[in-house]
Amino acid sequence: FLLPALNAPDEIYHWQRAVQVSHGQLLADRRKGQDYGGEIDTAALEFAQWAKSHFERPSAFSLTQVRQISATLAESSGMVRASFPSSASFSPLAYLPQAAGIAMARQLGGGVFEQLIAGRMLNVWVYLALMAAAAWVAPCGRRLLVLFALTAPALHLAASVSADPLNIALPALLFAWCLRLRLDETSRLTRRSLWGLGLMLVSLSLLKPIYVLLSGMALLVPVRHFGSARERRIFLLATIGAGLALTLAWNAAYPFMPGRYWGTGADPKAVLLHIIQAPRASLAYFFQSLQHQLPIMWIDGWGRMGGYPPPFMLNAPKALSWAALATMLAIAAFDGADRRDLRASAFMATLAVVFTCVIFLAFWLTFSPPGSAVIQGVQGRYFQLAFLLTGWALVCAAPFGAYCQRLVTPLFIVGLTLQMASLLQGIEAFRFYWTN
């Protein structure tokens, strides 16, 4: 209720995909030129178009206006063919919570506003449940994980119909489980646990294509849980291989290049040719982009609420963002694991770096306009899992051992206070919406 309708990043498009899934259509219709979509409620499409017109001006609207337009659209019956390729190209997995809420509200006679609220509520409940499960399962770094889960942008995304909450929470739970298994002295996983771990690894491929990389966290699980090194190899090859095959098959069926859709002029062939012909210049450009964009990604990922121009977007003060980063790094450094594990630390740090570089490379190839000073299109929310891996790597390294653990609780309180300040500032910025 406190966040403007369809205001989260790309929520307009996530809304249409969630509505489609709520009708049981898991696979979007495919058309020529990477144009995907399908039939959704006429009222749902008109609601999205109404909100989009306000975002593009930009022109503020109120909660009362949203309720009024919802009541008006109740007269718009039937289905209409819609195009929303930026979300229709994704699998339905990350839309199941929102779709369930939308379907329940529609079944109870609710209009588009009630459906939106129901979808948002179920989405945030599932997100919080998964992150709570991850914090319970994690053998170390729980305070860091809680802070990570409760940042203002994370809660803002969770309280929307975006696919991002599940994209964050499911891998976080997998990371926590793999770390617990690494420290668990149990001789072997049960068959049920093996199936559960395998399904989680395969499910990553249905979130985003590059998430197959994150299934590498299973390499941290010791041989003793599989019975033998051979059985471990078979399990990892089967699950990671199945995930890779699934993501390749999905993206072959629903190929999508953001630059073509958003009209940026991105040219993957030209970029690849430039990398081959001028590797040094390409590498320098790549690292220049990292150096320039990564600090912005933290500020954006920790302190931005809203996905459209003001008044529909707010950035927390930079000082607040940097103070939060310092606090979270201090917690990770001081709240060390009971047993220092430098191998796990190095592995997670490396995975975070590789994951980050692959994201930048993907946007360089598929989105960034030719001739741009740095790689464009990246957003802080894309790097949330890289931030989490980096923090957990620091926890496992335990640079200060147990000497500074008495400082962790005060730092945790400071971190929560900073995040509450950011969240309240965002809610206050949207006063124009929820007070009218």
Predicted feature residues:
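Interfacial juxtamembrane loops and adjacent helix segments
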Residues: 23-118
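Transmembrane-helix signature of polytopic, membrane-embedded enzymes
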Residues: 110-113, 132-152
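Membrane-interface alpha helices of multi-pass inner-membrane proteins
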Residues: 155-157, 192-209, 214-220
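Short acidic/glycine- and proline-prone juxtamembrane loop motifs at membrane-interface regions
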Residues: 160-167
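Perimembrane helix-loop-helix junctions
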Residues: 177-188, 212-244
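Membrane-interface helix-loop-helix junctions at transmembrane boundaries of multi-pass membrane enzymes
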Residues: 226-235, 330-353
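Transmembrane helical bundles and short interhelical boundary loops of multi-pass, membrane-embedded
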Residues: 245, 249-271, 378, 404-436
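Membrane-lumen/periplasm interface segments of multi-pass, membrane-embedded glycan/lipid transferases
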Residues: 247-336, 436
